[in-house]
Every structure is written in structure tokens, then in C-alpha cells.
Regions:
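Conserved phosphate-donor/acceptor-positioning beta-strand/loop module used by diverse small-molecule
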Residues: 89-90, 100-132, 165
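ATP-dependent small-molecule kinase phosphotransfer cores
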Residues: 32-102, 129-130, 134-138
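Walker A/P-loop
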Residues: 20
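Small-molecule kinase domains that catalyze NTP-dependent phosphoryl transfer to phosphate-bearing small molecules
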Residues: 70, 125-177, 181
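ATP-binding Walker
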Residues: 17
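Extreme N-terminal, non-catalytic leader segments
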Residues: 1-7
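P-loop (Walker A) phosphate-binding loop of NTP-binding proteins
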Residues: 14, 26
């Protein structure tokens, strides 16, 4: 790690842009890995509901509505603790960002890539992404861009980032861009 490396690295960005790869990169550098979506997955498992993209969005919005827009960040920070070093994936709400900015040593990265590249990556995952073609993928993404105060606010979250990293080249190119952060 370089001197002055952040204690907490937050990741926001579009679906298939490389947030998971960025989280894995920082984990290999010694950061504990957390995802705000894990809080939602735990809730879905508790309810016995399948973990699908639609269920993650719906349940995340319901949790924010019931417990406050920053609930996912609060629950995740409770696991990290005040002195932990972590990379935090799946940040999609400005209240989550506001809460995390109050933590010492927090930096937010927005990860993006061209939509066609992201769609191809998502298709390779083999997960239920609820988008069978590029048009459906774009439509689903539009729903995530600005869902209101207690929903997903992807566009505002990306605009709040300290740095935008475009992942449109090789894996090595992406890692070089990430290395500048840690």
C-alpha cells in the first residue's frame, strides 16, 4: 500500500462495469471485502426468497424505506468497525455515501464502461440479471438511475464520486488505474 492510502474504498457504478473486479483487486491488497448488497442478500435468505436482481432492488428499497436511506451502509460499517480497512461495493444511494463520508479515510470510486461492453460482461456471468437483450438491459439500468431518496440513485452516486475510472480496456489497464488509488 502506498503512504496515505484510504482506509475505506467505496465502489459505485454501472452494472457490469467492473466493481466486483475492483473489489477483488483491493481485497488482494489487504482490504477486507464488503458489499452493501450482502445486507440485502441476508434479508432475502432470511425470508426464503430467491436472490435475483429484481428482488435485490425491491428489498433494498424496502429496507431503506423502513430503516432509513443509509441503513445498508450503517449495517455494513457495524461489521467493519471503526479501525477496519475495507473495500465496500454496491453503493447506490447518496445517503449511503453521506454516512460513509463521515467515516475517517473514505474515498468513493465510480466504475463505468460502455453499455455494450457491460452487457457482454453481464451475459458471461450466467446470473439472473433480468435482462435478456441489450434493450432490456438499458431499460433496467434506467430504473436504477434515480429511484428517489430511499431507493437506488446510481446517477447521483456516480456524480458524488471522488474519481471516475472507465474500465474499457484490458484487465491490466484497469488494474493500473486502480493502483493509483491504493
Amino acid at each position: 500500500m502506498t503512504k496515505g492510502a484510504p482506509r475505506l474504498i467505496g465502489l459505485t457504478g454501472t452494472n457490469g462495469a467492473g466493481k466486483g473486479e475492483a473489489a477483488a483487486y483491493f481485497a488482494a491488497k489487504g482490504y477486507a471485502r464488503f458489499s452493501l448488497s450482502d445486507v440485502i442478500r441476508e434479508e432475502l435468505e432470511r425470508r426464503g426468497e430467491p436472490v435475483s436482481r429484481d428482488n435485490l432492488i425491491r428489498t433494498g428499497n424496502a429496507l431503506r424505506e423502513r430503516f432509513g436511506a443509509d441503513v445498508l451502509a450503517r449495517r455494513t460499517m457495524a461489521k467493519i468497525g471503526p479501525d477496519g480497512r475495507a473495500v465496500i461495493d454496491s453503493i447506490r444511494n447518496t445517503s449511503e455515501i453521506g454516512y460513509l463520508r463521515r467515516q475517517e479515510g473514505f474515498v468513493l470510486l465510480a466504475i463505468d464502461a460502455p453499455v455494450e461492453v457491460r452487457f457482454a460482461r453481464v451475459a458471461l456471468r450466467g446470473r439472473d440479471e433480468s435482462a435478456g437483450d441489450l434493450e432490456a438491459f438499458r431499460k433496467k439500468e434506467d430504473q436504477e438511475r434515480d429511484g428517489g431518496a430511499k431507493a437506488q440513485q446510481l446517477e447521483a452516486s456516480m456524480a458524488a464520486a471522488d474519481r471516475l475510472i472507465v474500465n474499457d480496456g484490458t484487465l491490466e489497464d484497469f488494474h493500473r488505474r486502480l493502483e493509483e488509488v491504493a
